[in-house]
């Protein structure tokens, strides 16, 4: 997979950088694995906005992805690589020997016609799913379960991978993409390799309209609003915030406040916290 740059024929193509979609082998999804999806547009069950800047965008159908990989010791053939509008990663369509079809997150390097399998005693190859207890130290994994049988909950985005660092007792230490080292039960399943489409980080939408197609609405700084709309608003010209620190539109502390509970039970499973990102490298903006 590669990225594609455009000549500045128009202002929209001047900054546009997209993936070339060369790994996509079929334009139409598997009919039996798609369902309608009602888009909530950032609202909760009462219709109140809980996530701002969401709405619009192209109509989508949800692809049913197999995050459990619970068909044990049954060979599956990669029939196609499909596009998924709900994620940056690609989907691999699997045809199992018993006739069932399933989608999985497409690992990097997996080709059409390749065989993958899930089980405890399967070959150490990219795309195969197995318990963390049987994976070699230093191997890269993705689609990691937090609880056995619940399905993959971590390391699912495009280009992501975790590294098996150590094994001790009933737990396996994983180094996550955030640099956090966390203990996971050894019977939890994961898939070997990293998630494909890693070049997505080098792309650029190029224009505001393309962002609207994805369902993202404009984001306005609080400092340019009126005081009735945001705590940062009001004043003459470029006025300061007027508070000890930045806050959300609802008056809660923002930009740097730790939100994880100090007595959370899973704290004992975190061996090393993630590396702090400095304000300069983060490039945060006014909320």
UniProtKB/Swiss-Prot annotation:
The keyword rRNA-binding applies. Residues 258-287 have a biased composition (Basic residues). Pfam families: Ribosomal_L2, Ribosomal_L2_C. One of its GO terms (cellular component) is large ribosomal subunit. Keywords: Ribonucleoprotein, Ribosomal protein, RNA-binding, rRNA-binding. SMART domains: Ribosomal_L2, Ribosomal_L2_C. SUPFAM superfamilies: Nucleic acid-binding proteins (SSF50249), Translation proteins SH3-like domain (SSF50104). It comes from the Bacteria. Residues 221-287 are annotated as: Disordered. One of its GO terms (biological process) is translation. Disulfide bonds: none annotated. GO terms for molecular function: rRNA binding; structural constituent of ribosome; transferase activity. Part of the 50S ribosomal subunit. Forms a bridge to the 30S subunit in the 70S ribosome. HAMAP family: Ribosomal_uL2_B. Belongs to the universal ribosomal protein uL2 family. One of the primary rRNA binding proteins. Required for association of the 30S and 50S subunits to form the 70S ribosome, for tRNA binding and peptide bond formation. It has been suggested to have peptidyltransferase activity; this is somewhat controversial. Makes several contacts with the 16S rRNA in the 70S ribosome. This is Large ribosomal subunit protein uL2. It comes from Prochlorococcus marinus (strain MIT 9215). The lineage of its organism: Bacteria, Bacillati, Cyanobacteriota, Cyanophyceae, Synechococcales. The gene is rplB.
């Amino acid at each position: 997979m590669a990225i594609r740059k455009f000549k500045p024929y128009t202002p929209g193509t001047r900054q546009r950088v997209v993936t070339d979609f060369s790994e996509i082998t079929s334009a139409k999804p598997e009919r039996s694995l798609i369902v309608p999806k009602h888009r909530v547009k950032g609202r909760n069950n009462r219709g109140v906005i809980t996530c701002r800047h969401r709405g619009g965008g192209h109509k989508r159908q949800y692809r049913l992805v197999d995050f459990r990989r619970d068909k044990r010791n049954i060979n599956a053939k990669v029939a196609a690589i499909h596009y998924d509008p709900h994620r940056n990663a690609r989907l691999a369509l699997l045809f199992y020997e018993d006739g069932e079809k399933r989608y999985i997150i497409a690992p990097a390097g997996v080709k059409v016609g390749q065989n993958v399998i899930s089980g405890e005693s399967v070959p150490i190859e990219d795309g195969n799913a197995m318990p963390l207890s049987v994976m070699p130290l230093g191997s890269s994994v993705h689609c990691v379960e937090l609880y056995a049988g619940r399905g993959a909950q971590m390391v699912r985005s495009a280009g992501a991978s975790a590294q098996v660092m150590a094994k001790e007792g009933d737990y396996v230490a994983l180094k996550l993409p955030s640099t956090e080292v966390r203990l996971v039960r050894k019977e939890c399943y994961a898939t070997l390799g990293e998630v494909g489409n890693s070049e997505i980080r080098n792309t650029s939408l190029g224009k505001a309209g393309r962002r609207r197609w994805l369902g993202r609405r404009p984001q306005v700084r609080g400092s340019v609003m009126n005081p009735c709309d945001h705590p940062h608003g009001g004043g003459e010209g470029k006025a300061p915030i007027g508070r000890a620190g930045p806050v959300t539109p609802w008056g809660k502390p923002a930009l740097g406040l730790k939100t994880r509970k100090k007595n959370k039970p899973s704290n004992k499973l975190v061996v090393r916290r993630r590396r702090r990102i400095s304000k300069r490298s983060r490039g945060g903006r006014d909320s």
